[in-house]
Amino acid sequence: MKERILQEIKTRVNRKSWELWFSSFDVKSIEGNKVVFSVGNLFIKEWLEKKYYSVLSKAVKVVLGNDATFEITYEAFEPHSSYSEPLVKKRAVLLTPLNPDYTFENFVVGPGNSFAYHAALEVAKHPGRYNPLFIYGGVGLGKTHLLQSIGNYVVQNEPDLRVMYITSEKFLNDLVDSMKEGKLNEFREKYRKKVDILLIDDVQFLIGKTGVQTELFHTFNELHDSGKQIVICSDREPQKLSEFQDRLVSRFQMGLVAKLEPPDEETRKSIARKMLEIEHGELPEEVLNFVAENVDDNLRRLRGAIIKLLVYKETTGKEVDLKEAILLLKDFIKPNRVKAMDPIDELIEIVAKVTGVPREEILSNSRNVKALTARRIGMYVAKNYLKSSLRTIAEKFNRSHPVVVDSVKKVKDSLLKGNKQLKALIDEVIGEISRRALSG
C-alpha cells in the first residue's frame, strides 16, 4: 500500500519536482483511511502543504478511497541544550561588509534554483527556524548571491540582529592569527558570542584541515544551541566533503540541505536580461539569446560576456550585432558550441552589405532594380558557389522554383555578355564568404 501511494504521487509530479521536494518524503504510517507522511524538516512540510496539497489528496484518495485523508509530519532535530526557539534576540548591526547587489530581488528564479531560493528566503524571514541551511552547487551558480541576500534582507528588516558573512579561508586565517597572538578567547567570543547570524562561504576550503574543523564544530554547536542561524555554502554536498570530520558533516545535514543546479536556457535568458537591467544597458534580443544559449557553464562567465559586449558598445559607439557578438565572445564559448549560421542566411546578410540593399527588401516582392539585382546575385551564388539545392534556395528567398531557375540563368547570361559591374559584386560577395570562413 505504501509503495502504491508513493507511486501514485510520483506520477503526478515531474522528475525535477520529485527530486527537489520529495527526496526526504516517505509514508510513515497508514491508519485506516489516514496516511501520515514524513519529511526531513519543517520547511519542506510547509512547502508541500502549500504547493502540493491537492496532489497528495488526490493520490491518497485514488489508493484508499474518497474518504482518505493525510497529514505531514517532520523529524525535528533535538539541540544539545533546552533552547529550541527561533532566534529572538535583537542587538547591533552588520559585522562584515555585504555586496548590496546581492539581494533576493536581483536573483532570477528557475527550476534549478527554486528550492534553494525559497529556503534562503525563509531563513532570512525566520532566522533560527531552519537551522542550519546548507546550500551547495557548482562554481558561479549563485551560492554567494543567496548567502549575502540573506544577510542584506536581515539587515534591512531586522536591523538589530548581528550578521556576519565570512569565507572559510577568513575563518581559518582569523583562527591562526588569534593562536599566534594568544587571543584564542577573543576569537571564540567574536564567532560564538557576538554574532546572531553566521554566513559561511566556501566551506570546502577546510577539507583536510582538521584543527580548524574542530574549532568550527564547537562554534557551530554553541551557535545552534543558542538558536542562532547558521548558513553554509559549498561546491559539493555534505557527504562528499572528503577528509571532513563525520560529526561536522552530520551537523551540516541535520537542517535544510538545498542544491543549486545549472540554469536552463530560459532561466539564463532571464538572468541575462536582469544583468542588463542592473548595468543599465541594452543589447539586441538575438544577441542576448545567443549569449544565453552558448555561455552556459556559470553565471559569472555569463555576466562577464555581457559586460564585454556593453563595454565594446560604449567604447566604439557601435551597436553589437550577432556577427560581432560571436567574434567578441570567442573566449567565452566552448569549441563547437556556437551554432553555425545557416549558409544562405549568412549569404543574404553579405549580399545586403555589399549591395546596400536591406535584407528585408531582398526577401520582399520589390521590383526595384537594385533589389532585383541583389536578389538574383544571392540566388546565383547560392546555386553555383554554395551548391545549395534549388528547393532550399526557393525556401530561403521566398520564391518559387521556376523563379530561382530563371534568376540564376539571367545572372549567368549577363556574365557571359561581359557585365563587369555584376561580376565585381559577385566577386566581392564570394570574397567575403571566403574571408569569414577562414576567420572561423
Swiss-Prot record:
Transmembrane segments: none annotated. PROSITE patterns: DNAA (PS01008). Mg(2+) binds at T144. GO terms for biological process: DNA replication; DNA replication initiation; regulation of DNA replication. ADP binds at V108, N113, G140, L141, G142, K143, T144, H145, R300. Keywords: ATP-binding, Cytoplasm, DNA replication, DNA-binding, Lipid-binding, Nucleotide-binding. The keyword GTP-binding does not apply. Residues 314-440 are annotated as: Domain IV, binds dsDNA. InterPro entries: AAA+_ATPase, Chromosome_initiator_DnaA, Chromosome_initiator_DnaA-like, Chromosome_initiator_DnaA_CS, DnaA_C, DnaA_dom, DnaA_N_dom, DnaA_N_sf. One of its GO terms (cellular component) is cytoplasm. Plays an essential role in the initiation and regulation of chromosomal replication. ATP-DnaA binds to the origin of replication (oriC) to initiate formation of the DNA replication initiation complex once per cell cycle. Binds the DnaA box (a 9 base pair repeat at the origin) and separates the double-stranded (ds)DNA. Forms a right-handed helical filament on oriC DNA; dsDNA binds to the exterior of the filament while single-stranded (ss)DNA is stabiized in the filament's interior. Belongs to the DnaA family. This is Chromosomal replication initiator protein DnaA. It comes from Thermotoga maritima (strain ATCC 43589 / DSM 3109 / JCM 10099 / NBRC 100826 / MSB8). The gene is dnaA.
